[in-house]
Curated annotation (Swiss-Prot):
Gene3D superfamilies assigned to the protein according to its UniProt record, in alphabetical order: Divalent-metal-dependent TIM barrel enzymes
One of the record's GO molecular function terms: intramolecular oxidoreductase activity, interconverting aldoses and ketoses
E.C. numbers: 5.1.3.22
Pfam short name (any one): AP_endonuc_2
UniProt xrefs under InterPro entries: L-Ru-5P_3-Epase (IPR004560), L-Ru-5P_3-Epase_Enterobacteria (IPR023492), Sugar_Epim/Isomerase (IPR050417), Xyl_isomerase-like_sf (IPR036237), Xyl_isomerase-like_TIM-brl (IPR013022)
GO BP annotations listed: L-ascorbic acid catabolic process
Protein name, UniProt field: L-ribulose-5-phosphate 3-epimerase UlaE
Name of the encoding gene: ulaE
Family: Belongs to the L-ribulose-5-phosphate 3-epimerase family.
Reactions catalysed, as given in the entry: L-ribulose 5-phosphate = L-xylulose 5-phosphate
The entry's keywords: Isomerase
Length: 284
């Protein structure tokens, strides 16, 4: 049985696609998860959630209450399309407006943590000016988040600007704000030439959640668990020994699979077995 001190969640994109959150949370509960992480990506469909009516927001809150499965975090990857570091003022303004709406949405439905994508720009060429604009955009975003009491947490990315906890800590020190923290992805962290254990230890005190996935160098998505380079047992041991007691989120993109629930159940069992070996949970 999963320890109550270690919440285990599943990414929305691992579960069947659709807009019925009651069904999604019921399935997550059946699969043994404590929470689901919402995705607001660069697609128009998921971006439109930020414009939900009061009734739509209330339906999500009611689904959470009915199922007991929380939605405590949002993966906000929409800034790939509307980056805060864009040299196009109109695009950057859209990025800041998305941030404002996301923070308001989080405040309305009880989301505590918004995971940020650490891209100054994604589809354009980066330079000193895009990085400066990105820093300024983060500063403005954290000011908004502070007023709303919503935490912004930087993901460790598949992108050189933010591919280590050490680099993300630089932004945390620059912003010097308790509402800006870190949300490492042990898959992304392992795919680069990082000393993963040292990086995880360096982040303790700033880590608010952890993404769990497997990766290979240069391959950051859809690597089956056990086929990549991540030393899960060592990562879990390091986090446990360092005093981290927060949530873990299995990140998968199986929403279009033939049987998403079966894929998720298989991954859940695999991850929990590694957690048990690390002394984090009881063996199944």
């Amino acid at each position: 049985m999963l320890s109550k001190q270690i919440p285990l969640g599943i990414y929305e994109k691992a579960l069947p696609a659709g807009e019925c959150w009651l069904e999604r949370l019921q399935l997550a509960k059946m699969l043994g998860f404590d929470f689901v992480e919402m995705s607001v990506d660069e697609t128009d469909d998921r971006l439109s959630r930020l414009d939900w009516s009061r009734e739509q927001r209330l339906a999500l809150v009611n689904a959470i209450v009915e199922t007991g499965v929380r939605v405590p975090s949002m993966c906000l990857s929409a800034h790939r399309r509307f980056p805060l570091g864009s040299e196009d003022d109109a695009v950057r303004a859209q990025g800041l407006e998305i941030m404002r709406k996301a923070i308001q949405f989080a405040q309305d439905v009880g989301i505590r943590v918004i995971q940020l994508a650490g891209y100054d720009v994604y589809y354009q060429e980066a330079n000193n000016e895009t990085r400066r604009r990105f820093r300024d955009g983060l500063k403005e975003s954290v000011e908004m988040a502070s007023r709303a009491q919503v935490t912004l947490a930087m993901e460790i990315m598949d992108y050189p600007l933010m591919n280590s906890i050490s680099k993300a800590l630089g932004y945390a020190h620059y912003l010097n704000n308790p509402w800006f923290q870190l949300y490492p992805d042990i898959g992304n962290l392992s795919a680069w030439d990082n000393d993963v254990q040292m990086e995880l230890q360096a982040g303790i005190g700033h880590i608010v959640a952890v993404h769990v996935k497997d990766t290979k160098p240069g391959v950051f998505k859809n690597v089956p668990f056990g086929e990549g380079v991540v030393d899960f047992e060592r990562c879990f041991e390091t986090l446990k020994q360092s005093g981290y007691c927060g949530p873990y989120l299995i990140e998968m993109w199986s929403e279009t699979a033939e049987d998403p629930a079966a894929e998720v159940a298989k991954a859940r069992d695999w991850v929990k077995a590694r957690m048990a070996k690390a002394g984090m949970v009881e063996a199944a």
